[in-house]
């Protein structure tokens, strides 16, 4: 039963790459760089 369920999940999830590629390529770097920029610009880092 579980082996027949897995291919249907993978077939229905073919649209996920068009969501994850922009998220990994744009959102994650923007969030990381903005956090690091705000962190290094603080007065009381330590």
From Swiss-Prot:
It comes from the Bacteria. Residues 1-11 form a propeptide. It comes from Nostoc sp. (strain PCC 7120 / SAG 25.82 / UTEX 2576). The keyword Transmembrane helix applies. InterPro entries: PSI_PsaI (IPR001302), PSI_PsaI_sf (IPR036357). It is found in: Cellular thylakoid membrane. GO terms for cellular component: photosystem I; plasma membrane-derived thylakoid membrane. This is Photosystem I reaction center subunit VIII. The chain crosses the membrane at residues 20-40. The cyanobacterial PSI reaction center is composed of one copy each of PsaA,B,C,D,E,F,I,J,K,L,M and X, and forms dimeric and tetrameric complexes. May help in the organization of the PsaL subunit.
